């Protein structure tokens, strides 16, 4: 990936097998964030460069294209609406169940949110505002939302500095959740 006057990524390749967890480590300015942003569709790769997954070539030039390829991204700032509940935050990612016609089926929404968080190891009251959750649980909500944004299987889940603002106990809890994803 080239920006005006600067090469940010050159001949970057890496392989990820199903169930693996990887961390990008490197000096400031080494291209970690640029690689993540290219994979997530926030930056277009230079012409002639693309992403290959499972022998399928993807032209990742937008967030929509990254989603179509099964790539999900959780920002460092999480993008949660702290004043509303976990149920509502998750529904922002995958839409509301309106099986009651035009009315939202809150019982179904609550059940779906509860299960999504339990799958990650977070047994929390999904009806309370996100502002009252701890750091690891908030990150868990963001991960659950990313995982449920579509019916397509997720190929890659990218977490941008997920432990940056977490105390030690929350880091351990988050790593437990990531291990459950394997």
Q: What does each model-identified segment do?
A:
Residues 1-182:
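Glycine-rich phosphate-binding loops of nucleotide-dependent enzymes
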